[in-house]
Every structure is written in C-alpha cells, then in structure tokens.
Amino acid sequence: MAKILILECLIFTLLSCGAVFWSIRPAAGGVLGRMHVYPPVIVDRCRALGIIPESGEGPEYNLERAVFILVSIPLQSCLCFFFGGCRDFLSAFLQSYLMWITELWFEVLVFGCGWFCHASRWVIPGTEDLADAYHDYWYHIKGGILGMSMRAVLAAPVGFLVNLLADLIA
C-alpha cells in the first residue's frame, strides 16, 4: 500500500511540475505568469513600475489555476479508484489530501525555497534591490501552511467522485 501511495504522489507531483513549467513559458509572460509566488513587496514594486496591472494576477493565472484543478480532480479520482483501490469517501479523501500536500510541500521547498529564492531567472528587472524579499523562505513556508487547508477543500471532490464511481460500478 505504501508503494502505491508513493507512486500516486509522485505521479501527481510530476503533473504539478509540468504545470509550473507551463506557466513560466514565454507565451504566458515568463516569470510574470507566476506573480502569485512573489512576496507582496515585489508585486507592489512591479505595479509601481507598470510591469503588471493594478488589478491583480490577471485572467491568465485564474484560467490556468482552474484548468489545473479541473484536470487534477479527475486524475486524482482515477488514481485513487483504479490504482489505489479506494472505494469510499474517506479513503479517497485521505489519499487525495496526501497527494495534494505532497505536491504542495514539493512546490514550497523545491520551487519556492530552492529555485525561486536562489535563481536569478526569477528576479524581475527593476526589483534587483529587493534581494531580502527574494530570499525570504518564511514567505513560501507560510504559504504552504495556509495552503494545506485549501488542499483539504480540493480533496473533498475526489472523495465524492470515488464514492460515486464505486456506487456506479458495484
């Protein structure tokens, strides 16, 4: 069972990595396509410089997030049902939550604290003097802690879908 859980988490984390790389492609605005990972002081500077609009992250970010969630929930449901053997809400919810928090902490520790805090690729021209904000690990860790509750909300539909699949197939 542990091997299956690890494999499910690995598959889902790889999907998430693909989504991150997709969101920083040049057609999506490069690193500006991930403004939600930047500390507020950097976002404020970018707004002041006119690099990003005053209105927020923009419709592209919201669309990409919605697509990722709409792909992730059925994918996790299939992983839990067909691969993990879940047939009830609770077991599917727990497996889905485990996949979500594995993906979350991978993103926080590897992409946030590792790549974002140390790669010059993420430094936006005009914000170079904000090095302390770029190296703020705590900002990413706080986001991970807060994100754990949001992941529980995202795991619930997986539990419902798996429960529905079990009823339909049984």
Where are these regions (language model features)?
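Juxtamembrane/disordered regions of integral membrane proteins
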Residues: M1-L98, T102-A170
